[in-house]
From Swiss-Prot:
PTM description: Src-dependent phosphorylation at Tyr-179 upon EPHA4 activation increases the guanine exchange factor activity toward RHOA. Phosphorylation by CDK5 upon EPHA4 activation by EFNA1 may regulate dendritic spine morphogenesis.
InterPro entries: DBL_dom_sf, DH_dom, Ephexin-1_SH3, Ephexin-like, PH-like_dom_sf, PH_domain, PH_ephexin, SH3-like_dom_sf
Keyword Cell cycle listed: no
Main localization of the protein described in the UniProt heading: cytoplasm
Domain PH: 489-601
Name the record gives this protein: Ephexin-1
Gene name per UniProt: NGEF
Location of the SH3 domain: 612-673
Length: 710
C-alpha cells in the first residue's frame, strides 16, 4: 500500500516538473493593460515587427564591444567598397531596423534628395541609422573617420537640391566679361597659380621632406591636421578661374547656394577642384556665347555693313557664324539644365562628347575658311574706305570693350581649342577608372579629332596657295620636278651660304668661295636654287628628303662658325653630292639641321617612352610662328625642351597636343621644380593613355614604312 502511494507521489512530482518546464519555454502571454508604459510601447513595437517579414530588434550598438567592432568594419568598408556594398545588400534582404523609416513604397523620383543620397551610400545610411536613435549614434571620435571616408564624396551628394532656374540665369547674365577678356585673364591666372604651386613645393622640398617621416609620425600629423581641414579646403588654389571681384565672375564655391548648403564641409579638396573645372567650362561657354552674339548683332547684322559689302564678300567674311551661334546656344542651354539639376555638378563631359560628335562640324567649316577670311578682311580695309571707317566706329562702341573686330572673327577657333584644354583639366581631376573618366576621355578624343580637322582645313587652304606661288617662281636648270602635290607642303625656306672649290683653296682670306644659295625644303623633297632677278629662283639640284644627311663641323674659328655639311645620297643626276653650308647664326644652323634630317634615333620614338625628367617651360607671352618650322604659342602652354641654342631659341614639344617647333626662349619661363615637371608629364600621360592601340600601331607601321622607303 505504501509502495503504491509512493509511486503515485513520484508520478505527481514528475508531472508538475514537466508542466513547469513547458511553462518556462512558452512565450509569455501578458495582457497589455497589465504592462507598464515602457513595456507596453515595446510590446506594440514587437507586434508591428511580427507583422513585417524578416524584421528583428536591433542590438545595443553603443556598447564598448560594438563600438570597437564598428570601427573595424568601417575601416574595412573604406578599403573595400565593393564588400561594403554587398554587406549592405545582405542587410537589406534580412530586414530593416525599427529605428529606420520605411521608404520602400515611396517612388525614387519623389524621395527627398538627402534621403536618396544616404540610401545610395552605405556609409551615409549607417550614419543616418546610428544618429536617428539616442544612445545608438556614432561617438565623436568616430566622426572624423567617417567624414574622411570616400563614400561621403560625390556618391553621397548626388542629390542635394537643384539650383533655381532664375538664380542660374541671373548668374549667366551677370558674367560681364567678353570671351576675349575671360580667356586672357583665365590663362594669366593659370600661369600665376603654377608659379605659386612651384614656389610652395620648392619651399616644402627645402624643408624636411615628407618621405622621411615614419608612419607613426604621419598618422600623428594627420590627426593633428584633421580638425583644421575644413578651413584649408576653402583656401584651395584657384584653377584657371578668375577670382577678381571686379570682374563680376564667381567661382563655384562662392555661389550663395553652395555656401548655404554646407557641401564645402563635406566634399574633399579634389572633388572641389573638379567642381570648379566643370563650372569653368559652363561659365566660359556663357562668356563665349555673349561675344559670339555680339559679333552677329553688332557687326554682321549692321545695316551699313550690309550696304557696303557685296553678298559674296560678306559670306567670306562671316562664313557660317550663324550656324556656330546656334550650336553654341543649344550647347549652353543643355549645360544650364545640367547645372539646374543639382548644386553639385554630376558631369558635363557627356554633353561635350555628344555635341563634339554630332554638332561641332560647324567649327570645321568656319575655321577652314580662315585663310580666305583674313585675306578678304585685309583687302576690304585697303580698298574700301567706307568699310574701314565703319569698322573703326563700331569698335569704339562700349559693348566691344576696346577689342578689335578681328578678335571677334577668330572666336570659334579659339573656343574649340580652349574647350579641349578645359576637358583635359576635368580629366586630370576625375577618379581613375571611373565612369566620369571614361566619359571625359571620350569627349577629349572627339574634341581632338575636331581640332585636328580644323587645323588640317586651315593648312590645306594655305598650303595649296603657297605651293602654287612657289611653282610660279621656279625655273629649272635641270630636269623639271613637279612641285604641286596634295601630299606635299613646305617645311622651311631660306638663304644659306655655300662654300665651293677644293679644300686646299678654302682659306680664310678667300671670301669669294662663299656663294649664296636658296633652299626650299618640303616634307618629302629638297630643292636647291639660286636667286635671280625678278623674284625668281633657278633650280640646279634636288633630292628626296629621305636621302639627306647632315653633319656639324667642329669649331674651326669665327669664319667657319655655324657651318655644317649636307650630303645628298642621290641627287637629281642620280649621284651623291656634298654641300658645305654656313648659316647666319647658331640657331639658324640647328634649325636647318633639324629640318633637313631629324635625329633618326628619336624621330619615331613614342611620346611615352621619353625620359621623365625632361626640362620644361611654360608660355608667359603669346607667340605667332613666323616660319613653317616655328611653333605658335598660347599663354599657359607647357612644353618639353628637346633642344636649345645659345642665342635664345628653343626646340620644344607642347604637351597637350604633342606639336613640335622652334620658339624664342624669351616667350617662356622654365619650370625648375622636378615635382611639378613630373606632375605635368603624369597628367599628360593620363590624357593620352586611352589612345586606340590599333590606330597607334597602324600609325607606327606607316611611319616605319616611310622610313624604309627613304
Amino acid at each position: 500500500m505504501e509502495t503504491r502511494e509512493s509511486e503515485d507521489l513520484e508520478k505527481t512530482r514528475r508531472k508538475s516538473a514537466s508542466d513547469q518546464w513547458n511553462t518556462d519555454n512558452e512565450p509569455a502571454k501578458v495582457k497589455p493593460e497589465l504592462l507598464p508604459e515602457k513595456e507596453e510601447t515595446s510590446q506594440a513595437d514587437q507586434d508591428i515587427q511580427d507583422k513585417e517579414p524578416h524584421c528583428h530588434i536591433p542590438i545595443k550598438r553603443n556598447s564598448i564591444f560594438n563600438r570597437s567592432i564598428r570601427r573595424k568594419s568601417k575601416a574595412k568598408a573604406r578599403d573595400n567598397p565593393e564588400r561594403n556594398a554587398s554587406c549592405l545588400a545582405d542587410s537589406q534582404d534580412n530586414g530593416k531596423s525599427v529605428n529606420e523609416p520605411l521608404t520602400l513604397n515611396i517612388p525614387w523620383s519623389r524621395m527627398p534628395p538627402c534621403r536618396t543620397a544616404m540610401q545610395t551610400d552605405p556609409g551615409a545610411q549607417e550614419m543616418s541609422e546610428s544618429s536617428s536613435t539616442p544612445g545608438n549614434g556614432a561617438t565623436p571620435e568616430e566622426w572624423p573617420a567617417l567624414a574622411d571616408s570616400p563614400t561621403t564624396l560625390t556618391e553621397a551628394l548626388r542629390m542635394i537640391h537643384p539650383i533655381p532656374a532664375d538664380s542660374w540665369r541671373n548668374l549667366i547674365e551677370q558674367i560681364g566679361l567678353l570671351y576675349q577678356e575671360y580667356r586672357d585673364k583665365s590663362t594669366l591666372q593659370e600661369i600665376e597659380t603654377r608659379r605659386q604651386q612651384d614656389a610652395e613645393i620648392e619651399d616644402n622640398t627645402n624643408g624636411s621632406p615628407a618621405s622621411e617621416d615614419t608612419p607613426e609620425e604621419e598618422e600623428e600629423e594627420e590627426e593633428e591636421e584633421e580638425p583644421a581641414s575644413p578651413p584649408e579646403r576653402k583656401t584651395l588654389p584657384q584653377i584657371c578661374l578668375l577670382s577678381n571681384p571686379h570682374s563680376r565672375f564667381n567661382l563655384w564655391q562662392d555661389l550663395p547656394e553652395i555656401r548655404s548648403s554646407g557641401v564645402l564641409e563635406i566634399l574633399q579638396p579634389e572633388e572641389i577642384k573638379l567642381q570648379e573645372a566643370m563650372f569653368e567650362l559652363v561659365t566660359s561657354e556663357a562668356s563665349y556665347y555673349k561675344s559670339l552674339n555680339l559679333l552677329v548683332s553688332h557687326f554682321m547684322e549692321n545695316e551699313r555693313i550690309r550696304k557696303i559689302l557685296h553678298p559674296s564678300e560678306a559670306h567670306i567674311l562671316f562664313s557660317n557664324v550663324l550656324d556656330v551661334l546656334a550650336v553654341s546656344e543649344r550647347f549652353l542651354l543643355e549645360l544650364e539644365h545640367r547645372m539646374e539639376e543639382n548644386i553639385v555638378i554630376s558631369d558635363v563631359c557627356d554633353i561635350v562628347y555628344r555635341y563634339a560628335a554630332d554638332h561641332f562640324s560647324v567649327y570645321i567649316t568656319y575655321v577652314s575658311n580662315q585663310t580666305y577670311q583674313e585675306r578678304t578682311y585685309k583687302q576690304l580695309l585697303q580698298e574700301k574706305a567706307a568699310f574701314r571707317e565703319l569698322i573703326a566706329q563700331l569698335e569704339l562702341d562700349p559693348k566691344c570693350r576696346g577689342l578689335p573686330f578681328s578678335s571677334f572673327l577668330i572666336l570659334p577657333f579659339q573656343r574649340i581649342t580652349r574647350l579641349k584644354l578645359l576637358v583635359q583639366n576635368i580629366l586630370k581631376r576625375v577618379e581613375e577608372r571611373s565612369e566620369r573618366e571614361c566619359t571625359a576621355l571620350d569627349a577629349h578624343k572627339e574634341l581632338e579629332m575636331v581640332v585636328k580637322a580644323c587645323n588640317e582645313g586651315v593648312r590645306k587652304m594655305s598650303r595649296t596657295e603657297q605651293m602654287i606661288s612657289i611653282q610660279k617662281k621656279m625655273e629649272f636648270k635641270i630636269k623639271s620636278v613637279p612641285i604641286i602635290s596634295h601630299s606635299r607642303w613646305l617645311l622651311k625656306q631660306g638663304e644659306l651660304q655655300q662654300m665651293s672649290g677644293p679644300k686646299t683653296s678654302r682659306t680664310l682670306r678667300t671670301k669669294k668661295l662663299f656663294h649664296e644659295i636658296y633652299l626650299f625644303l618640303f616634307n618629302d623633297l629638297l630643292v636647291i636654287c639660286r636667286q635671280i632677278p625678278g623674284d625668281k629662283y633657278q633650280v640646279f639640284d634636288s633630292a628626296p628628303r629621305g636621302l639627306l644627311r647632315v653633319e656639324e663641323l667642329e669649331d674651326q674659328g669665327q669664319t667657319l662658325a655655324n657651318v655644317f655639311i649636307l650630303r645628298l645620297l642621290e641627287n637629281a643626276d642620280d649621284r651623291e653630292a656634298t654641300y658645305m653650308l654656313k648659316a647666319s647664326s647658331q640657331s639658324e644652323m640647328k634649325r636647318w639641321m633639324t629640318s633637313l634630317a631629324p635625329n633618326r634615333r628619336t624621330k619615331f620614338v613614342s611620346f611615352t617612352s621619353r625620359l621623365l625628367d625632361c626640362p620644361q617651360v611654360q608660355c608667359v607671352h603669346p607667340y605667332v610662328a613666323q616660319q613653317p618650322d616655328e611653333l605658335t604659342l598660347e599663354l599657359a602652354d607647357i612644353l618639353n625642351i628637346l633642344d636649345k641654342t645659345d642665342d635664345g631659341w628653343i626646340f620644344g614639344e607642347r604637351l597637350h597636343d604633342q606639336e613640335r617647333g622652334w620658339f624664342p626662349s624669351s616667350m617662356t619661363e622654365e619650370i625648375l621644380n622636378p615635382k611639378i615637371r613630373s606632375q605635368n608629364l603624369k597628367e599628360c600621360f593620363r590624357v593620352h593613355k586611352m589612345d586606340d592601340p590599333q590606330r597607334s600601331q597602324n600609325k607606327d607601321r606607316r611611319k616605319l614604312g616611310s622610313r624604309n622607303r627613304q
